[in-house]
């Protein structure tokens, strides 16, 4: 009936996205340099790309602390200057995927977070905490004024790890209240938020960011899966 009455919504398509705000380079666990990832993003028609290497606090990779972020900023500024001189409409943003530690504290202090263009807060450890503990932990990050995006909120890995016990409804309500953006992680192993929670996020008034969480130049090829979830 909606089709007959021409009331079908205009759904998101790949070409609607102008960039991503969550990706990694050789500064942490990525396999390509800042410039290599930037060029890969440009080839996809992006106008911006967020460099969000892991902060300290994630034991499996070398985290980027405040001092290394200052050095990384110089590299990003140089890349942006190169694009500007060439008249290229593309801009790198400096950020961090900030670890939400087991006690709810963050892998970077506020004085560092406030210098970033974008901060993505994510949980990678202690994922079997009980519902109240992990929800309070996540909410602490959401209410931090320097956190912009909540990354892969439920932590699931399809086929290998179930989602955490997170009270997603409470967290989405907090994101709507604070303006914290909620991620749809396009990695086919994650697709997190899933379609049901993504719809609920929109109903509550949350903003959504679709990111590939790319760790290599071809890691941006999976964006369509995030688009499909959003649709």
Label every PLM stretch briefly.
Residues 93:
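General small-molecule cofactor/ligand-binding pocket signal
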Residues 1-25, 31-51, 55-90, 102-231:
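Charged catalytic cores and adjacent phosphate/nucleic-acid-binding surfaces used
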């Amino acid at each position: 009936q909606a089709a007959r009455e021409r009331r079908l919504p205009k759904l998101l398509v790949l070409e609607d996205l102008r960039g991503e705000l969550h990706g990694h380079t050789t500064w942490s666990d990525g396999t390509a340099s800042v410039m290599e990832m930037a060029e890969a993003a440009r080839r996809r028609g992006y106008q911006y790309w967020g460099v969000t290497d892991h902060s300290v606090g994630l034991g499996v990779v070398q985290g980027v602390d405040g001092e290394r972020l200052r050095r990384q900023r110089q590299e990003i500024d140089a890349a942006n200057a190169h694009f500007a001189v060439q008249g290229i409409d593309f801009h790198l943003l400096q950020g961090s995927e900030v670890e939400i530690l087991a006690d709810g504290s963050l892998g970077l202090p506020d004085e560092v977070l406030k210098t970033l263009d974008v901060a993505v807060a994510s949980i990678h450890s202690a994922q079997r905490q009980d519902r109240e503990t992990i929800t309070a932990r996540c909410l602490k990050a959401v209410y931090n004024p320097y956190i912009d995006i909540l990354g892969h909120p439920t932590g699931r890995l399809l086929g290998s790890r179930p989602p955490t016990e997170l009270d997603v409804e409470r967290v989405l309500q907090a994101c709507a209240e604070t303006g914290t953006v909620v991620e749809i992680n396009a990695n086919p192993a994650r697709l997190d938020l899933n379609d049901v929670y993504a719809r609920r996020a929109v109903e509550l008034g949350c903003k959504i960011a679709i990111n590939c969480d790319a760790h290599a130049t071809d890691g941006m090829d999976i964006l369509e899966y995030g688009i499909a979830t959003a649709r």
